Amino acid sequence: MVMTDPIADLLTRVRNANIARHEAVEIPASNIKKAIANIMLQEGYITDLEEYNDGAVPMLKITMKYGQNKERVITGLKRISKPGLRVYCRKDEVPKVLNGLGTAVISTSKGILPDKEARKLSIGGEVLCYIW
């Protein structure tokens, strides 16, 4: 079966693992999923990111991050720009998630960047998702 929205698949798998308080989640790898997972790692939403080859399909293993008493670090994940309705922003319209407490993931001409980096470089792009 062909996956129509791999970013939504990544977010859904991470959201479900987070709700069920799983230690880790495995997803089929792609360059865009790797870039989004790297941003999650840089921003402190996940503990570890590992890529391995499981036969014909390369996989990503994302180790989830929890607080002291298994409190969730990721409160929410939301897909913004969808295949049926793309959402773009100009350099002066880069969104802030929860007044800067969350992260917007933006696909720019310089690659996939968090909102803070896009603001610093003064570039806009396609708003892929929000993480908070």
From Swiss-Prot:
Keyword RNA-binding among UniProt keywords: yes
Keywords on record: Ribonucleoprotein, Ribosomal protein, RNA-binding, rRNA-binding
Keyword Ribonucleoprotein included in the entry's annotation: yes
One GO cellular component term noted in the UniProt record for this chain: ribosome
GO biological process, one term: translation
GO molecular function: rRNA binding; structural constituent of ribosome
Cross-referenced Pfam families: Ribosomal_S8
SUPFAM superfamilies for the chain: Ribosomal protein S8
Similarity-based family: Belongs to the universal ribosomal protein uS8 family.
Function: One of the primary rRNA binding proteins, it binds directly to 16S rRNA central domain where it helps coordinate assembly of the platform of the 30S subunit.
Assembly information from the UniProt record: Part of the 30S ribosomal subunit. Contacts proteins S5 and S12.
HAMAP family documented for this protein: Ribosomal_uS8_B (MF_01302_B)
NCBIfam families given in the database record: PRK00136.1
Name of the protein described by the UniProt record: Small ribosomal subunit protein uS8
Gene source species: Clostridium tetani (strain Massachusetts / E88)
